[in-house]
């Protein structure tokens, strides 16, 4: 299986039930090549994000136009929160900048049910923590920590 692009990972993430935008996520608006940071999420669904191209805080009426950066550490933290408290993260790198044996470094396992069974096994090996979080949510079919 070939590695997905950043945009493909983003589309998978935002398409799953339980998804919600969170301040601190690194985002990009469509064709803009530079990444900005999500600053606020309003109750009506609008989002404010810092756009480095215009060097100002913009309000987006259509957050579905935004891509998230699955390789950004702050975004990965938000994705972990969306998975909820019953997760285990496996890091197979020896050092912070080294991948695991197969070039993939992270696995995330979500546990469900009263006995704490893994939602899917085996977990998918991914090159970043954010991608591993998205893969775990995709295997589960939802973001359990994002549901009310």
Whereabouts are the PLM-identified features?
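Short aromatic/hydrophobic-glycine micro-motifs
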Residues: 17-19, 85, 142
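Intrinsically disordered, low-complexity regions enriched in Ser/Pro/Gly/Gln/His and often acidic
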Residues: 2, 12-14, 43, 58, ...
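Extreme N-terminal leader/activation tails
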Residues: 1-38
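Short intrinsically disordered terminal tails
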Residues: 1-4, 113-118, 134-148
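N-terminal segment of the canonical double-stranded RNA-binding domain
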Residues: 26, 31-126, 145-148
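Short Cys/His-based metal-binding microdomains
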Residues: 125-136
């Amino acid at each position: 299986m070939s590695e997905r692009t950043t945009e493909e990972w983003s589309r998978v993430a935002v398409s799953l039930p339980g998804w919600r935008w969170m301040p601190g996520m690194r985002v990009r608006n469509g064709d803009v090549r530079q990444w900005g940071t999500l600053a606020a999420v309003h109750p009506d669904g609008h989002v404010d994000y810092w756009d480095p191209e215009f060097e100002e805080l913009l309000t987006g009426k259509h957050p579905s136009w935004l891509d998230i950066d699955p390789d950004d550490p702050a975004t990965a933290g938000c994705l972990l929160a969306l998975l909820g408290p019953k997760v285990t993260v496996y890091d197979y790198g020896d050092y912070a900048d080294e991948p695991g044996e197969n070039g993939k470094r992270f696995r995330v396992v979500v546990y469900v049910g009263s006995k704490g069974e893994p939602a899917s096994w085996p977990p998918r090996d991914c090159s970043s923590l954010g991608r591993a979080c998205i893969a775990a949510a995709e295997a589960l079919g939802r973001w359990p920590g994002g549901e009310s």
